[in-house]
Amino acid sequence: MNTYRIHIRSDEFQYTNEIEATNVEEEDGWTVFWNGKDVFMRIRDEHIVSLERLN
């Protein structure tokens, strides 16, 4: 499990948090977060201000 710090912004909200994921992939304008074989979050790349792997 890897820990990531993510900062997301859109017209409606701003969000910063640390999340744990086994894998992160970028595909077709989306950043996809995996926990094993399951996707638990998909975010449009245009909303991601920063994404940093902490470990």
Where are these regions (language model features)?
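Hydrophobic beta-strand residues in large extracellular and virion-surface proteins
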Residues: 4-6, 21, 33, 48-51
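Short, mixed-charge low-complexity intrinsically disordered segments
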Residues: 36-55
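Short, flexible N-terminal segments of the mature chain
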Residues: 13-36
